[in-house]
């Protein structure tokens, strides 16, 4: 067992794996809650297996927003202690577990890979848009989804937020894209 653990620790580049997992996590955000959970858990596991906690803590200490997120999660966790209904408190706290991913992304994502994360998110939103328009124009159906509210994979409120975020990314890409073909594609996608 010890040799297997040594083999993996010596031969795996955890940071490369983490960067791929972050891209897959971004892809799943508008499409699959199960995918978000799976890749979120894998991100946490590989981040812990990577170790290098001293450098990670130093990075986190330099970013106040990440510190605030960690403080919020810590306070939320300790609030279970004074809750009268522990089961409800734990269930409510589960909503915030995705915030654990933010320090992992901050400490692991390489600057060169940020474009891949945004592109994965945009591609999954494109898939979601195509399915949504298909439902809206009644080209196909999906159980429980009506043409009047064609948000196929997530609830309407989340889908609206994802659409707004997608719009911001697309505007950025339209303004700063040097490739004319891609610029036209982003304009059509935006419309």
Residue ranges of predicted features:
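Aromatic-anchored transmembrane helix interface
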Residues: 65-72, 86-109, 116, 120, ...
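Residue-level preference for alpha-helix termini and adjacent loops
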Residues: 77, 81, 89-92, 144, ...
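Alpha-helical transmembrane segments of multi-pass inner-membrane proteins
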Residues: 77, 114-144, 154-191
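Short hydrophobic "helix-edge" motifs at membrane interfaces and signal-peptide entry regions
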Residues: 23, 69-70, 145-146, 190-191
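Transmembrane signal-anchor hairpin modules in multi-pass inner-membrane enzymes, especially those
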Residues: 1-77, 81-87, 107-115, 119, ...
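Juxtamembrane membrane-water interface segments that cap and precede transmembrane helices
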Residues: 18-23, 140-152
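Residue-level signature of transmembrane alpha-helix interfaces in integral membrane proteins
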Residues: 46-48, 95, 144, 171
